[in-house]
């Protein structure tokens, strides 16, 4: 069984990190797949996001970090992953993620999506929110790992 946790991670938040750590305890191994989304202009380029994630996950030896573009289901197929992990912060996330899960299932019937609820300490977090707070000089050390905090502060100087 191979588990795929996809996302843009622009940037990685403590919510993402918590989900990865919890999934690693449950499943043992996990592939974090960083999307190069050509329809968005990211704050950090793909290479920088991968470095941020690897730095933040160095204490977890069973986590592999890769990049991909295109459909998540195609990435899962290429890796022979049969489970896609998604985090849920609120009911609105569930509605969106369920639609994506059904789409992925329609493209590959062997792919299942597993949902983990977000730790309540991080249920308010989103990458967009973190960037907004950082942009206006707010404190983000409780929202993101240290290397991401430094990168965001440098970016918004």
Swiss-Prot record:
Entry's EC annotation: 2.7.7.3
Binding site for ATP: 8-9, 16, 87-89, 97, 122-128
Domain of life from the UniProt record: Bacteria
Location of the protein in the cell: Cytoplasm
Keywords tagged on the record: ATP-binding, Coenzyme A biosynthesis, Cytoplasm, Magnesium, Nucleotide-binding, Nucleotidyltransferase, Transferase
Residues at which substrate binds: 8, 40, 72, 86
Subunit structure, interactors included: Homohexamer.
Name under which the protein is recorded: Phosphopantetheine adenylyltransferase
Organism: Prochlorococcus marinus (strain MIT 9301)
């Amino acid at each position: 069984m191979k588990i795929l946790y996809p996302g843009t991670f622009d940037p990685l938040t403590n919510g993402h990190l918590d989900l990865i750590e919890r999934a690693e305890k449950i499943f043992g191994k996990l592939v974090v797949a960083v999307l190069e989304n050509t329809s968005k202009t990211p704050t950090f380029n793909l290479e920088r996001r991968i470095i941020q994630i690897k730095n933040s996950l160095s204490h977890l030896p069973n986590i592999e970090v890769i990049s991909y573009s295109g459909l998540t289901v195609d990435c899962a197929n290429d890796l022979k992953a049969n489970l896609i992990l998604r985090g849920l912060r609120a009911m609105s996330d569930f509605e969106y993620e369920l639609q994506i899960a059904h789409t992925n299932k329609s493209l590959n019937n062997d792919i299942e999506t597993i949902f983990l609820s977000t730790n309540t300490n991080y249920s308010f977090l989103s990458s967009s929110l973190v960037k907004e707070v950082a942009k206006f000089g707010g404190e983000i050390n409780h929202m993101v790992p240290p290397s991401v905090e430094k990168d965001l502060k440098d970016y918004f100087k």
